[in-house]
From Swiss-Prot:
Residue intervals annotated with topology Extracellular: 22-305
UniProt-annotated stretches for the region Connecting peptide: 296-305
Pfam families to which the protein is assigned, alphabetical: C1-set, MHC_I
Family (UniProt): Belongs to the MHC class I family.
InterPro entries, sorted: Ig-like_dom (IPR007110), Ig-like_dom_sf (IPR036179), Ig-like_fold (IPR013783), Ig/MHC_CS (IPR003006), Ig_C1-set (IPR003597), MHC_class-I_related (IPR050208), MHC_I-like_Ag-recog (IPR011161), MHC_I-like_Ag-recog_sf (IPR037055)
Self-association state and partner proteins as the record states: Heterodimer of an alpha chain and a beta chain (beta-2-microglobulin).
Species annotation: Mus musculus
Official protein name in the record: H-2 class I histocompatibility antigen, K-D alpha chain
Lineage of producing organism: Eukaryota, Metazoa, Chordata, Craniata, Vertebrata
């Protein structure tokens, strides 16, 4: 198995998953960043249920604590938050050690800034059986080591990671991870879905429209927007006379809108005057049927254009008449001689280690 680079996973925040009948996912993303001369490495951990961030820990906070990031998590009592805070602080120490160990493996100096990351969690189906478990690590933005889909073996990305793999294989760490992913991870996902049922199991249909962006005298860009939808799983495609233009589209990753919903757009360059031949198709579970959109010059714009053109013609005629009358009058007043004029003054014109128990716990084995 080739693990996905965690920087890309973090940038994307979370791969889209469906809600209601399933599948569902629980995932944690953890990052430790060394900063020589500025104190201890910064440690950040965030947790997601499906497409929603629900917990966070930041070692740079005034009072570093595991805290809720979704209103429904406030139902958990003080004991839960205290326990998770202690686990996060324990994991913070593990990541600091791992950063130093990785620097040694790669023969790096202590003067540079480095990043160690981890993503772990589980995907479950509608029957609550495990579909996929994750334990992936990255160093300086590159894959380091990952638990394979069989949850029994590891894939090391390079010779440095081979050292860690041998150590973890000897210690039987894969078995420990597997027990968590098949058991407690699934149970905690069920718990969080119960707490956030109204939010996590909702469906917000996208609001879609097409915008027009001139490029040159021969072509334009048509951009199809989908806004305010949840969950994040959505498909936008452009078609020309019924044929998909997937290879010719510019497609951005689905992005959080900041209000619990998501947004996305897809663009295609088309010949000027051929805009009507292109259609955008939007597929989302919140829609009773897929949307089909086409760029059209709004009727109001056509009417306004006609009105403006008429007004321009009338205005030009009025101005021309006024100028002619003014000149004729001045010529009469001056006996046909021209008059010189001068302008008056001023008249110019947008975690964790090996889980155990609930969410987080210190790994029994570091990279060393």
């Amino acid at each position: 198995m080739a693990p996905c680079t965690l920087l890309l996973l973090l940038a994307a925040a979370l791969a889209p998953t469906q809600t209601r009948a399933g599948p569902h996912s629980l995932r944690y993303f953890v990052t430790a960043v060394s900063r020589p001369g500025l104190g201890e490495p910064r440690f950040i951990a965030v947790g997601y249920v499906d497409d929603t961030q629900f917990v966070r820990f930041d070692s740079d906070a005034d009072n570093p604590r595991f805290e809720p990031r979704a209103p429904w998590m406030e139902q958990e009592g003080p004991e839960y938050w205290e326990e998770q805070t202690q686990r996060a602080k324990s994991d913070e120490q593990w990541f600091r050690v791992s950063l130093r160990t990785a620097q040694r493996y790669y023969n790096q100096s202590k003067g540079g800034s480095h990043t160690f990351q981890r993503m772990f969690g589980c995907d479950v189906g509608s029957d609550w059986r495990l579909l996929r478990g994750y334990q992936q690590f990255a160093y300086d933005g590159r894959d380091y080591i990952a638990l394979n889909e069989d949850l029994k073996t590891w894939t090391a990305a390079d010779t440095a990671a081979l050292i860690t793999r041998r150590k973890w294989e000897q210690a039987g760490d894969a078995e420990y991870y597997r027990a968590y992913l098949e058991g407690e991870c699934v149970e905690w996902l069920r718990r969080y879905l119960e707490l956030g049922n109204e939010t996590l199991l909702r469906t917000d249909s996208p609001k879609a429209h097409v915008t027009y962006h001139p490029r040159s005298q021969v072509d334009v860009t048509l951009r199809c927007w989908a806004l305010g939808f949840y969950p994040a799983d959505i498909t936008l495609t452009w078609q020309l006379n019924g044929e998909d233009l997937t290879q010719d589209m510019e497609l951005v990753e689905t992005r959080p809108a900041g209000d619990g919903t998501f947004q996305k757009w897809a663009a295609v360059v088309v010949p000027l005057g051929k805009e009507q031949n292109y259609t955008c198709h939007v597929h989302h579970k919140g829609l009773p049927e897929p949307l089909t959109l086409r760029w059209k010059l709004p009727p109001s714009t056509v009417s306004n254009t006609v009105i403006i053109a008429v007004l321009v013609v009338l205005g030009a005629a009025i101005v021309t008449g006024a100028v002619v009358a003014f000149v004729m009058k001045m010529r009469r007043n001056t006996g046909g001689k021209g008059v010189n004029y001068a302008l008056a003054p001023g008249s110019q014109t947008s975690d964790l280690s090996l889980p155990d128990g609930k969410v987080m716990v210190h790994d029994p084995h570091s990279l060393a």
